[in-house]
């Protein structure tokens, strides 16, 4: 016990606790790995239900207390943000590395030796993947990109219509391509807006050219199409100005009340006029628009849209070269509207898409935009569809920007495992043991893929190892490096033929993130947990009554 009133755990005990927590976490998500993985139903404290098999979403919704387990949660979230795919794999790999390291340390191998061996193994694994497993996606053309997207959504709900959604993800990102970047074209994910609409089947989801807003014009009398639109993005309400609460006005003549009301209306009209005089013919605001303001817009044939989402206005402002304005007041307190803050687009129109009226912005000045309308039976369905499609968009973005892909279906992990086993034998130091355990941990991914498919994992992984061993030892069989698990036919197959590809950056980052997380936890030899401070009781007054 510490003098601070906390608890201290050190040595082997804390290491065992951390490894157990990590393995327990991995056991929870491992059944959701792969194209035939299962979903999880999570119910929060207020009864909201989430059904998903996305590793990052599952771990984010869990109430985690153990500090080592929190590291794995952050690991999955980092992988989700950086790549979009591989969140479950990275947690399973980190847990396997920890479990194998714990076995080594139990056999009196020093943790520092294990850590050095893991770092060396990770470096060699990344080098091998980049030099021997990577493939230029341009050689496969658009079909290669579609296969990458299909692989990313193979374990998701939208796999039922994978052909349509993979094509949609690729078309959406290619539609928002922005050339002229320092490293070539860039593909901003935020330029693709995803809208959800209940009803119909998911096969009726569609891709729209332009940025779609789930809003309508404030009045039926406003035009439905504005050509050569100049757009004002406002983060405040356009309503009649009223004096704030607490302001008292003393009048001697009741007729002066009408003058006050008239001045309030004039202030509102002046604000509207400043916006219109700047050239704006489309006004989008996050707040409300009252009838008085609406009247002024209708008179000049302008379109006004209220209650827009702030994030949508930010994205649209970026695409059109405009700026989101939070107030008309300048630094000196005067109300002005700068015309340079207007966005420009070829057309803004209100159209009926599916069962809803939407505002669609086409031909923005700075960079193009696209929107995807998702249809589904209920909230759970469309929410999971959105998560799945977002992951697929991120994966395709990474491939488009890096141009490099690797075979999926456990091919990379098995090839690296065989390579590291042989590499470990070339070392005469104790790190050889750690590298061999790292190689064994790599097989946790193909084994789990086979287990989730309900097939004999031992036989299938042994056959896959045989293929990759021959590819590395026999030059005439080098093409075997493309072989992975074909879980639909319960056999091994050429990933090029079955179209299973993943981004190179996904594999590299998964390896690095999992290794660093395992090393971070292995370096811990002391856990000091302080007790919560009791809050003073303030039920009574200062005298204690």
Curated annotation (Swiss-Prot):
Superkingdom = Eukaryota
GO-annotated cellular components: cytoplasm
Which CDD domains does the record match to this protein?
TCP1_alpha (cd03335)
Q: Which UniProt keywords apply?
A: ATP-binding, Chaperone, Cytoplasm, Nucleotide-binding
Please tell me whether the keyword ATP-binding is annotated for this protein: yes
Gene3D superfamilies in alphabetical order: GroEL (3.50.7.10), GroEL-like equatorial domain (1.10.560.10), TCP-1-like chaperonin intermediate domain (3.30.260.10)
- Pfam annotation, one family: Cpn60_TCP1
Q: Which InterPro entries match?
A: Chap_CCT_alpha, Chaperone_TCP-1, Chaperonin_TCP-1_CS, Cpn60/GroEL/TCP-1, GroEL-like_apical_dom_sf, GROEL-like_equatorial_sf, TCP-1-like_intermed_sf, TCP-1_chaperonin
* Quaternary structure and interacting proteins, as annotated: Heterooligomeric complex of about 850 to 900 kDa that forms two stacked rings, 12 to 16 nm in diameter.
What family is it from?
Answer: Belongs to the TCP-1 chaperonin family.
Its annotated function is as follows:
Molecular chaperone; assists the folding of proteins upon ATP hydrolysis. Known to play a role, in vitro, in the folding of actin and tubulin.
| Name used for this protein in its record | T-complex protein 1 subunit alpha
Q: Which organism is it from?
A: Schistosoma mansoni
Taxon lineage:
Eukaryota, Metazoa, Spiralia, Lophotrochozoa, Platyhelminthes
Q: Which gene encodes it?
A: TCP-1A
């Amino acid at each position: 016990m510490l003098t601070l009133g906390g608890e201290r755990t050190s040595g082997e005990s804390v290491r065992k606790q951390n490894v157990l927590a990590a393995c327990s976490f991995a056991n929870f998500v491992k059944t959701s790995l792969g194209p035939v993985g299962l979903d999880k139903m999570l119910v929060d404290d207020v009864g909201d239900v989430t059904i998903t098999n996305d590793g990052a979403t599952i771990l984010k919704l869990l109430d985690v207390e153990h500090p080592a387990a929190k590291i794995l949660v952050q690991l999955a979230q980092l992988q989700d943000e950086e790549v979009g795919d591989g969140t479950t794999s990275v947690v399973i790999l980190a847990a396997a590395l920890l479990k194998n390291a714990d076995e080594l340390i139990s056999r009196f191998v020093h943790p520092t030796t294990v850590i050095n061996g893991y770092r060396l193994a990770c470096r060699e694994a990344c080098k091998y993947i980049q030099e021997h497993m990577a493939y230029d996606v341009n050689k496969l053309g658009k079909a290669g990109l579609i296969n990458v997207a299909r692989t990313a959504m193979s374990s998701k709900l939208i796999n039922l219509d994978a052909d349509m959604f993979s094509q949609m993800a690729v078309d959406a990102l290619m539609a928002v391509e922005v050339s002229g970047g320092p490293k070539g074209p860039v593909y901003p994910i935020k330029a693709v807006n995803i809208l959800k609409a209940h009803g119909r089947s998911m096969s009726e989801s569609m891709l729209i050219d332009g940025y779609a807003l789930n809003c309508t014009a404030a009045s039926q009398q406003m035009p439905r199409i504005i050509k050569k639109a100049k757009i004002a993005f406002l983060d405040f309400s356009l309503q009649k100005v009223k004096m704030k609460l607490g302001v008292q006005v003393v009048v001697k003549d009741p007729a002066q009340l009408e003058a006050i009301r008239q001045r309030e209306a004039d202030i509102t009209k002046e604000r509207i006029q400043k916006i219109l005089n700047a050239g704006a013919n489309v006004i989008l605001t996050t707040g409300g628009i009252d009838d008085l303001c609406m009247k002024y817009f209708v008179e000049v044939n302008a379109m006004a849209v209220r209650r827009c989402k702030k994030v949508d206005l930010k994205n649209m402002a970026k695409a059109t070269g405009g700026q989101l304005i939070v107030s008309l007041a300048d630094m000196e307190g005067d109300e002005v509207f700068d015309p340079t803050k207007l966005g420009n687009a070829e057309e803004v129109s209100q159209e009926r898409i599916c069962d809803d009226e939407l505002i669609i912005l086409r031909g923005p000045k700075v960079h193009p935009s696209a929107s995807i309308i998702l249809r589904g039976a209920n909230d759970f369905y469309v929410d999971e569809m959105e998560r799945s499609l977002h992951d697929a968009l991120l994966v395709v973005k990474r491939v488009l920007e890096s141009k490099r892909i690797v075979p999926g279906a456990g091919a990379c992990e098995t090839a690296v495992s065989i390579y590291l086993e042989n590499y470990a034998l070339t070392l005469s130091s104790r790190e050889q043991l750690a590298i061999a355990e790292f190689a064994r941990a790599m097989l946790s991914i193909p084994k789990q893929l086979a287990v989730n498919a309900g097939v004999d994992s031992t036989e299938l992984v042994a056959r896959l190892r045989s293929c990759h061993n021959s590819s590395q030892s026999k030059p005439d069989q080098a093409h075997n490096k493309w072989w992975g698990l074909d879980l639909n036919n319960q056999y091994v197959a050429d990933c090029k033929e079955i179209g299973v590809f993943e981004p190179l950056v996904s594999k590299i980052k998964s390896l690095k993130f999992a290794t660093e997380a395992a090393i971070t936890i292995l370096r811990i030899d002391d856990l000091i947990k302080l007790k919560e401070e009791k809050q003073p009781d303030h039920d009574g007054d200062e005298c204690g009554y």
